[in-house]
């Protein structure tokens, strides 16, 4: 069932998340923090809504044509069951890994995207800080395992990269949309031939507890606006008592 849409996904914030969210609001980001689900006092309700009725959204192969029309999982919801190939090509049980340690889960388009490459580098800079807080860092893209390895080697990444070459994970998270026409040949190639529908994920960041519940998210259809490493670290720090 289609959820209510907004171009910028801002919703209710618990008081513990308010400070980090207040800063992030200026990035035209995406927040969902359902105080009712988390049983926390509601500090503020922040909305920037250009509501789109579900029956007006144009769809193809089960996903919207526009990134603004995605229907992502909300804070308080649980992540789906997922097994994805790692850079080595071996199957990685995401749910098992999340159950062992609180997780910062990042969806990016691919190593070919300059904005994604910059984001990956920023994540590497704070990876030790995040692990010191008790988190693990996992990033997922449309790249094939071979291309994930290239990204890891080129940028000297020490955290886990997973391949969502067929966009199955992005679809389950509700962040997949139809890629622009200029990507028609490019996307199947970088995915190892698996992205036959030429889809892309909206760049997203999720903070998860060990139960697999989403505690925080940043989702922005504007591919140039990524959650900075410093702000991610601040958000992660603010949630330490809840993980």
Name each region found by the language model.
Residues 79-80, 102, 202-204:
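Short loop/turn microsegments at loop-to-beta-strand junctions
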Residues 92-93, 215:
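Generic structural signal for well-ordered beta-strand positions
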Residues 94-123:
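Short active-site neighborhood of thiol/selenol oxidoreductases, capturing the structured segment around
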Residues 164-224:
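Thiol/selenol-based redox catalytic cores and closely related redox-interacting motifs
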């Amino acid at each position: 069932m289609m959820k209510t849409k907004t171009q910028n996904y801002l919703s209710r914030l618990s008081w513990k998340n308010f400070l980090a969210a207040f800063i992030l609001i200026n990035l035209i980001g995406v927040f969902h923090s359902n105080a009712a689900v988390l049983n926390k006092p509601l500090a503020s309700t922040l909305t920037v809504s250009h509501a789109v009725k579900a029956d007006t959204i144009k769809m193809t192969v089960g996903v919207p044509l526009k990134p603004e029309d995605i229907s992502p999982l909300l804070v308080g919801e649980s992540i789906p069951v997922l097994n994805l190939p790692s850079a080595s090509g071996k199957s990685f049980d995401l749910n098992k890994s999340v159950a062992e340690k609180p997780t910062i889960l990042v969806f990016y388009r691919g190593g070919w995207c300059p904005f994604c490459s910059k984001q990956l580098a920023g994540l590497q800079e704070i990876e030790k800080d995040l692990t010191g807080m008790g988190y693990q860092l996992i990033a997922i893209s449309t790249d094939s395992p071979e291309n994930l390895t290239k990204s890891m080697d080129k940028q000297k990444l020490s955290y886990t990269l997973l391949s969502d070459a067929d966009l199955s994970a992005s679809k389950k998270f509700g962040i997949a949309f139809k890629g622009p026409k200029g990507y028609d040949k490019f996307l199947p190639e970088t995915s190892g031939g698996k992205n036959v529908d030429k889809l892309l994920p909206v760049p997203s960041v999720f903070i998860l507890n060990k139960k697999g519940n989403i505690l925080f998210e940043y989702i922005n259809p504007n591919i140039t606006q990524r959650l900075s490493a410093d702000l991610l670290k601040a958000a992660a720090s603010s949630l330490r008592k809840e993980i």
